[in-house]
């Protein structure tokens, strides 16, 4: 009951608390995060390519589908832990055998899972990656949607495999037909 205990604190509103790494197959945790979402809070699912069906984790796509079944998809965000450490486990998950690094590609991996395997319409599958995070971080109007006066951050996807074709960042084309044409400061 730790999640609900946090928001019982008079100084913490549900919208101020965003638990992450919540895509676990733990019924009690799922009950709590959905209760938080029903109170107006947001929850974040971690995207990974290597979720073993026998592990304690579920894919971010599976979590999003559970949220949709509970009419709570607009309370879910996805994150990648890009650049963060990801433990690599032995076969029975009893020992860490190495350390990997999270990559942003896992976000697109889970978007494809939602659209191609779970058959969620693209406009709904995009919510945890676009308008939902923009809303909780106070960026609505500038980020998360294509509209006049917004920053014009746009991914153009191939229709058949949802591969990234073009990237527009703040109105400037930075990737054309899959090739980087303008690099950022840290690339």
Task: Please identify what each model-predicted range represents.
Residues 146-187:
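C-terminal cap of metal-dependent C-N hydrolases
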Residues 51, 130, 182:
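Positions that flank functional sites
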């Amino acid at each position: 009951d730790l999640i609900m205990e946090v928001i019982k604190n008079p100084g913490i509103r549900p919208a101020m608390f965003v638990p992450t790494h919540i895509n676990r197959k733990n019924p009690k945790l799922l009950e709590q995060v959905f209760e938080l979402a029903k109170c107006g809070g947001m929850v974040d699912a971690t995207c990974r390519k290597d979720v073993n069906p026998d592990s304690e984790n579920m894919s971010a796509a599976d979590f999003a589908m559970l949220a949709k079944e509970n009419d709570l998809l607009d309370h879910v965000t996805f994150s990648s832990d890009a650049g963060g450490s990801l433990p690599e486990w032995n076969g029975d998950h009893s020992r860490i055998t190495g350390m990997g690094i999270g990559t942003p590609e896992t976000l697109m991996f889970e978007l494809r899972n939602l659209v191609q395997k779970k058959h969620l319409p693209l406009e709904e599958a995009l919510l945890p990656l676009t308008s939902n995070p923009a809303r909780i971080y106070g960026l609505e109007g500038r980020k998360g949607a294509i509209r006049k006066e917004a920053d014009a951050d746009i991914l153009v996807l191939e229709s058949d495999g949802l591969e990234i074709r073009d990237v527009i960042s703040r109105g400037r084309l930075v990737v054309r037909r899959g090739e980087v044409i303008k690099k950022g400061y840290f690339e």
